Amino acid sequence: MAIKQLSETLINQIAAGEVIERPASAAKELIENALDAGATRIEVATAGGGKTLLRVTDNGNGMSPADLELAIRRHCTSKIDDTLTDIRTLGFRGEALPSIGSVARLSITTRTAGAREGAAISVIGGKTESVRPSPANVGTVVEVRDLFFATPARLKFMKTEKAEAAAISEVVRRMAIAFPKVRFVVSGSDRSTLEFPATGDDRLARMAQVLGKDFRDNAIGIDAEREEARLSGFAGVPTFNRGNSLQQYAFVNGRPVQDKLILSAIRAAYAETIPQGRYPVAVLSIALDPALVDVNVHPAKSDVRFRDPGLIRGLIIGAIREALSRGGDRAATTGAQGMMRSFRPEAYRAEPHRAQAPWTAATSPYRPMRFDEPARGFAEAPQAAFQEFAQPAARPAETAPNGTVEPAFPLGAARAQLHENYIVAQTEEGLVIVDQHAAHERLVFEAMRTALHSRPVPAQALLIPEIVDLAEDDCDRLMAHAEEFLRLGLSIERFGPGAIAVRETPAMLGEMDASGLVRQLADELAEWDTANGLAGRLDYLAATMACHGSVRSGRRMRPEEMNALLRQMEATPGSGQCNHGRPTYIELKLADIERLFGRS
């Protein structure tokens, strides 16, 4: 068969196969055009998940009749001239409108501010009609009907109406985060109306609209710069995490992207604070010279290529970690909200037909606990593993004469210990409940990691070495990492076939189950990624040791020990979550407590 030139319609349909994969792809291209035209209000209407109808209305600059005629031609654009190294707009290829027109029924109505009347044009399955006069408001209305009617095979690959409508909503959410000064509305017969009023320069307010107010309450601001690149945005505290990565948003020069480099950098930044299988919530915006990033590497423009990827990755990881460190001991507020929802006041209401006897102190079987007296059952001496945090310098929080807590202590003053596992502390604004094991585990981990940067962790020799019987493979794996264990204060050596002798353990862990620790380390080494760097391996081992050497559940603590733990939490970055990403404390505001009792 001889080589021949394809028809313009077929060329556009081929391009549509790459650019317009589904209704959400068309919505993205049309919204980008509206934003490039300077719109401050964009309305999206859909039916049938965008397959039956997709209409995008904006109040942008509009087009003249001459520009409108060119707009539906392939590779006609006003956004670039003769180079791809200085792209400052969302669109630039001039492919979207002709591609959509080749597979759907496309109509465009537009008017510029200086024109007396508007202009309209239609393209049906690649066949273009002439430009005609039409009444119109300033701006542009692009209406797409019967998407893919000209290529019915594509319809077989469409998802359900609900799924396609949800994909369009997600496109609008990403655009809304990137452009807080623009009002977005999505409506239609296939959905509930979604509206994002403009928030001006308040980017966090727009993020609260899109991600919910929980994100606003649990976000830490990011603003960092390295060489030619600047990173801004917000990152959620580690305990505010999700079961998927759908709430990780990245933007490069205002363009929404789903770039693997950026997403992997986010994961790396949270690697030590979020458990496996959970994902952080973050909104990051990177601004840099357009010449330093190539946005023309993907048909949908969802991926980019940085000239210096190492710079971008380092900037993201460093900025997020610095922000989390600045966040200090913050834990997610959603824990307290979940606890509030678990209460069901109606279950405690008195039955109306049953007379209630008047309450008196004499007839009540309960007695209020006096917090000015030592609680019965507290240990007389601190646990060895806790002595580092129960020093005289870390004295209990003092209270003012009226009983209020000194504002210098955000986590308040310890008032009681519940079930020998939870510390209850009174704060200025309510109360805090601390998981003593999770909190101390994090403190020990941070102490070990800090010690590693300057010197090996101090060790304590066992009077009698502990012999641990293991499989030969486990012994080999443990001895292969003996040097790393030694830096962490754990000294092991071979003790004949199938046995390991533990001679020293980390001093800061006090008395501990050395045999249990060695067995757990052997199990974890069997599943370890050997490609991990030394720093990553040491952190992982330190986390395991910290778990074994922390204050255990069921251990009674004295008031000074509890207060010392609270003070150390306040002074330790990242103490709001344990090494597994779970919260170490939950805070209840006084207003929350009053709501539980029906107080206004």
Curated annotation (Swiss-Prot):
Keywords: DNA damage, DNA repair
One Pfam family matching this protein: DNA_mis_repair
GO molecular function, one term: ATP-dependent DNA damage sensor activity
Record-linked PROSITE patterns: DNA_MISMATCH_REPAIR_1 (PS00058)
Statement: the UniProt record of this protein carries the keyword Transport: no
A biological process term (GO) from this entry: mismatch repair
Keyword S-adenosyl-L-methionine in annotation: no
PANTHER family: DNA MISMATCH REPAIR PROTEIN MLH, PMS, MUTL, DNA MISMATCH REPAIR PROTEIN MLH1
Family listed: Belongs to the DNA mismatch repair MutL/HexB family.
Function: This protein is involved in the repair of mismatches in DNA. It is required for dam-dependent methyl-directed DNA mismatch repair. May act as a 'molecular matchmaker', a protein that promotes the formation of a stable complex between two or more DNA-binding proteins in an ATP-dependent manner without itself being part of a final effector complex.
Protein name: DNA mismatch repair protein MutL
Record organism: Sinorhizobium fredii (strain NBRC 101917 / NGR234)
